[in-house]
């Protein structure tokens, strides 16, 4: 399809130009009830999978927090590792970008790395109010560096900064591998996360959606919608569509991989044999034009020329 996208007058080229013209005219709106992003930090098991506690939190969110997307940094790193250029980025900067994108940051204090993450995030006054700290009840009143340093910094900023959830945590290496009583914090966690922070829709300008200059919730949601409208897509096809919408001045590959990484991490898109496609199967944004007509132009092209491309949806 890449050739057809680059060639003027083709069906998909006309569809892309039409899409671009409406984005240019600020015809994209973010609804007030859009899902929140929750960055979940903590330990990993010996096999590299998330700790049992983090898996319990993800399962809880999928069952009861339909207004939230939980995501892990590891899956974003994995997507970026497929590109040699992106490998030059240090993980601290990437994690900092992810924390800025998130509405909330949950840190389960269960490993040395999670204590390090707490210190890094608590250092930023902008991030302190996003933090939800899960800690062992036995450490509530302990005069430790954690309590007297990062946690005190969070609470001193304001009464609204951060949330602290405690329960009797199992200790030792087995606590990473096996579930404990983390369910004790589910009710207060639900109370924190189930609230919608925004009630009204927003009109989005073109420059706010450009993935070369933004890595935020709006640009991530827009990339999903592009894939849903125009896809399933290969990476080079996505780059060509984004270039036609936002212009040729920027190099999009590395920035798009970061966006794709977060979308894969929250299981909103998937990638099979180099083909990216939506698992969400609905638009994040509202469009003040016939977005389904543009989508049908792409789908008709695939059915005529690449019917095998549409088979990725068969197993969803």
UniProtKB/Swiss-Prot annotation:
GO biological process per UniProt: defense response to virus
Lineage of origin: Bacteria, Pseudomonadati, Pseudomonadota, Gammaproteobacteria, Enterobacterales
Keywords assigned by UniProt, alphabetized: Antiviral defense
Function statement: Possible ribosyltransferase/DNA-binding component of antiviral defense system retron Ec73, composed of a non-coding RNA (ncRNA) followed by this protein then a reverse transcriptase (RT). Expression of this retron confers protection against bacteriophages SECphi4, SECphi6, SECphi27 and P1. At multiplicity of infection (MOI) of 0.02 cultures grow normally when infected with SECphi4 without collapsing, at MOI 2 cultures enter growth stasis.
Protein name in UniProt: Retron Ec73 putative ribosyltransferase/DNA-binding protein
Phenotype caused by lack of the gene: Not required for msDNA production.
Note: Part of pro-retronphage phiR73, which is homologous to bacteriophage P4. With the help of P2 bacteriophage, is excised and packaged into an infectious virion. Retronphage phiR73 can lysogenize a new host strain, reintegrating its genome into the selC gene of the host chromosome and enabling the newly formed lysogens to produce msDNA-Ec73.
InterPro entries in the cross-refs: STM3845-like (IPR049725)
